[in-house]
Amino acid sequence: MKLIVISGRSGSGKTIALHVLEDLGYNCIDGVPFQLLAQLIDTVDPKNNKVAISLDIRNLPTDASQIQTLLSSLQQKVEVEIIYLDAISAELIRRYSETRRLHPLSKNKLSLSQALELENELLEPIHKRAALSIDTTTLSIHNLNERLKIHLQGSTKSNLLIIFQSFGFKNIHPDDADYIFDVRFLPNPHWEPTLQKYTGKDQPVKAFLNGHLVVKQTINQIENLFHSWLPYLEENNRNYVTIAIGCTGGKHRSVYVAEQLAAQFKQKYQVQIEHKGLKDQL
């Protein structure tokens, strides 16, 4: 039997992750008391060979050694894989302000920021054992769904997942990027009145940028760079690499370049595109 454990700080997207696993055929159980986890595994019908549970601060012991001991004992019985979700504290606070929910640790007379900091410490024993950690700070529900499905379902392509991100320097910088390319030197469609309302995914902007040699050269140079580097990253057992492309507002140039690069690499690699300036967050 395979047991997937979804954990992470409150507001990081665990419920969404469980819904994805349910769609993939997992028997999902939310909020299992930690002390009953071993008993649950012993009583699960053997036919249910794929089980997923969520573990959060509400159902964990305060003694970290108990967490380590139980996880180790479970791994002797079944295949256990931990997926840990998190986001920067400022984003978690924003999500809480929208839902107006109380943090589970707020009953200890802690502020929300203090509760999140304590929660981070208490969950660290689980985080350290995670096979996959996902930062959901700027992920849409669709992107989180896609990231989990690629990880769990596998692919006939290379195991390396390439994440192309577009962003605007005047907005948010991608803290999770491995490589960042600044394309603000490229011709800017923003200064063309007829193009301002479009994005780098729309044909008028694509035609404008495709008509400039420097844009084509830039894309080719980035493409050639990673055609050379990616095999070495694979040899070092990298699971994914994040390549961020930034322009001023994250609407035109960076979106176009990210889309073009993704199209070039998707034949051989698993590819995901995240346009931080265009989409809603979790």
Swiss-Prot record:
Gene3D superfamilies membership: P-loop containing nucleotide triphosphate hydrolases
Residue positions binding ATP: 8-15
Tree of life domain: Bacteria
Source species: Psychromonas ingrahamii (strain DSM 17664 / CCUG 51855 / 37)
Similarity field: Belongs to the RapZ-like family.
Binding sites annotated in the UniProt record for GTP: 56-59
Record's function text: Displays ATPase and GTPase activities.
NCBIfam families: PRK05416.1
Sorted UniProt keywords: ATP-binding, GTP-binding, Nucleotide-binding
Transcription keyword on record: no
Name of protein: Nucleotide-binding protein Ping_2894
GO MF, one example: GTP binding
